[in-house]
């Protein structure tokens, strides 16, 4: 067969509706919005080509390899209900296209180049199916849910956290004081804000020292294990590791990383260190909305969540369903289960396009944070269940009597909700009543109930843009 130069339609090579997907293929579901006049098969095939072996013209060197073995294939196209010019293109990628144990390489291939493609008006990666064979090349979360509970000796309830505010401007000593008060009042964790790294007003080493002091003092006084998410995110991987090593030397239980701004390579490096050295790893998703907020373009958060479980993290922020940050309930619960469970069935009503088996990767605790307070506690306990971290920043520090009473109020509200649930009461129906009853014997909770009695963050869903 002679080499035939020139441009030919992608669909001749990359649209293969007869293809039987293999157990080892990575499968992707893309929401494609083609330019007017571009047929769906051509657009779907273009996505498969540009994210695997294709380029814009036939090249002589195609003859030196086996395209059949290495090409991505668009194997199915389905229209999106209620959208005229949109459809879901399913693409299968042979496993050999990807480096083992590298989320970075997986994303560079699948979403690296194709999103700027001229034939498409918009493109969104809705979901990925990661095959068992590929998952087994990743360490995943440093410890996972069960090991974390055993380390902390805390069972049968969600864990409570609090982000220290104001996030920027406190000195290290005042910051440590706020940490101590929250932990002393009854929280399990406090947290560095995602943009607290090492700024002129508070260098990282000073903060680490004062926070460690706060942890040990509050542990001694409460008899409970406490933690503070020390943010190790830095400008270079070496500096990040230096901070993680210092945290380990202080003997604290947990560090933190901003995995999207820090990058997957840095994150996976840190996750490996955390497992080797017994540190838990809390993950913040700063920058996620840049990628996942638009309905037609970018990447859905469930893909970023799957990537994090592969790269490694023990906690990750996952929206609230009830607070100030958006999240539709079923969709949010879909990716919360993707983070926690070993096996998740395909369920389009929850946005899950593929059945996903996590083999033996540990689970990640979802963190609910953002505009939540004591009145939300019954809903949060009901929606997220025991395996979660409920994080109240303003909902702790905004208490009229101060940080420690704010922490007390949250802990009392949580214990009341868990107790009521265990007695068989319906939190969705009786939630407000349960909180009111508990506030009768907790003045701290009563004061919190009074401050936030009618606050609701209710706006139309943003996904309609």
UniProtKB/Swiss-Prot annotation:
Assembly notes: Heterohexadecamer of 8 large chains and 8 small chains; disulfide-linked. The disulfide link is formed within the large subunit homodimers.
N6-carboxylysine, modified sites: 191
Protein residues bound to substrate: 113, 163, 167, 285, 317, 369
A molecular-function term among this protein's GO annotations: magnesium ion binding
EC number: 4.1.1.39
Compartment(s) of residence: Plastid, Chloroplast
Binding site for Mg(2+): 191, 193-194
CDD domains (UniProt xref): RuBisCO_large_I
Keywords tagged on the record: Calvin cycle, Carbon dioxide fixation, Chloroplast, Disulfide bond, Lyase, Magnesium, Metal-binding, Methylation, Monooxygenase, Oxidoreductase, Photorespiration, Photosynthesis, Plastid
PANTHER family, A to Z: RIBULOSE BISPHOSPHATE CARBOXYLASE, RIBULOSE BISPHOSPHATE CARBOXYLASE LARGE CHAIN
Cofactor(s) listed: Mg(2+)
Enzymatic reactions: 2 (2R)-3-phosphoglycerate + 2 H(+) = D-ribulose 1,5-bisphosphate + CO2 + H2O; D-ribulose 1,5-bisphosphate + O2 = 2-phosphoglycolate + (2R)-3-phosphoglycerate + 2 H(+)
Modifications the protein undergoes after translation, according to the UniProt entry: The disulfide bond which can form in the large chain dimeric partners within the hexadecamer appears to be associated with oxidative stress and protein turnover.
Site (Transition state stabilizer): 324
Signal peptide positions on this chain: none
Family: Belongs to the RuBisCO large chain family. Type I subfamily.
Further details from the record: The basic functional RuBisCO is composed of a large chain homodimer in a 'head-to-tail' conformation. In form I RuBisCO this homodimer is arranged in a barrel-like tetramer with the small subunits forming a tetrameric 'cap' on each end of the 'barrel'.
First-level EC class: lyase
Active-site residues per Swiss-Prot or TrEMBL entry: 165 (proton acceptor), 284 (proton acceptor)
Organism: Morus rubra
Top-level lineage group: Eukaryota
Any one GO CC term of the record: chloroplast
Gene3D superfamilies: Ribulose bisphosphate carboxylase, large subunit, C-terminal domain, RuBisCO large subunit, N-terminal domain
PROSITE patterns to which the protein is assigned, alphabetical: RUBISCO_LARGE
Designated name of the protein: Ribulose bisphosphate carboxylase large chain
């Amino acid at each position: 067969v002679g080499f035939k130069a020139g441009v030919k339609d992608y669909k001749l090579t990359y649209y293969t509706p007869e293809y039987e997907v293999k157990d080892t293929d990575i499968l992707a579901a893309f929401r494609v919005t083609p330019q007017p006049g571009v047929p769906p098969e051509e657009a779907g095939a273009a996505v498969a080509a540009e994210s695997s072996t294709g380029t814009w013209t036939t090249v002589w060197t195609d003859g030196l390899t086996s395209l059949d073995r290495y090409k991505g294939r668009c194997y199915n196209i389905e229209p999106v209900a209620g959208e005229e010019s949109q459809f879901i293109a399913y693409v299968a990628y042979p496993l050999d296209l990807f480096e083992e144990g590298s989320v970075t390489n997986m994303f560079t291939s699948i979403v690296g180049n194709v999103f700027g493609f001229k034939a498409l008006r918009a493109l969104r990666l809705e979901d990925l199916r990661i095959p068992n064979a590929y998952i087994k090349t990743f360490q995943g979360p440093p410890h996972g849910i069960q090991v974390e509970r055993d380390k902390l000796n805390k069972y049968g309830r969600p864990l409570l956290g609090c982000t220290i505010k104001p996030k920027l401007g406190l000195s290290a000593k005042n910051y440590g004081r706020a940490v101590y008060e929250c932990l002393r009042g009854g929280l399990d964790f406090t947290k560095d804000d995602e943009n607290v790294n090492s700024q002129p007003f508070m260098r990282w080493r000073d903060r680490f020292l004062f926070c460690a002091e706060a942890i040990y003092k509050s542990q001694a006084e409460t008899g409970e294990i406490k933690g503070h998410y020390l943010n190790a995110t830095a400008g270079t991987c070496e500096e990040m590791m230096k901070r993680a090593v210092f945290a380990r030397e202080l003997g604290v239980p947990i560090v933190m990383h901003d995995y999207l701004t820090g990058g997957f390579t840095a994150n996976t490096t840190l996750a490996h260190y955390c497992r080797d050295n017994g540190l838990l790893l809390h993950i913040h998703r700063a920058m996620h909305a840049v990628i996942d907020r638009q309905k037609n373009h970018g990447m859905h958060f469930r893909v970023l969540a799957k990537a994090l479980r592969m790269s490694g993290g023990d906690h990750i922020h996952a929206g609230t369903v009830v607070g100030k940050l958006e999240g539709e309930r079923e969709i949010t619960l879909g990716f919360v289960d993707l983070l926690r469970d070993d096996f998740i069935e395909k369920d389009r009503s929850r946005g899950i396009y593929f059945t996903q088996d996590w083999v033996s990767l540990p689970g990640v605790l979802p963190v609910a944070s953002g505009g939540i307070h004591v009145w939300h506690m019954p809903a949060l306990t009901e929606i997220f269940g025991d395996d979660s971290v409920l994080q109240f920043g303003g909902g702790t520090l905004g208490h009229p009597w101060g940080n420690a009473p704010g922490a007390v109020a949250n802990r009392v509200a949580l214990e009341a909700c868990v107790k009521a649930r265990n007695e068989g009461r319906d939190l969705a129906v009786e939630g407000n009543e349960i909180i009111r009853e508990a506030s009768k014997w907790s003045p701290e909770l009563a004061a919190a109930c009074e401050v936030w009695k009618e606050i609701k963050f209710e706006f139309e869903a943003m996904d309609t843009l």
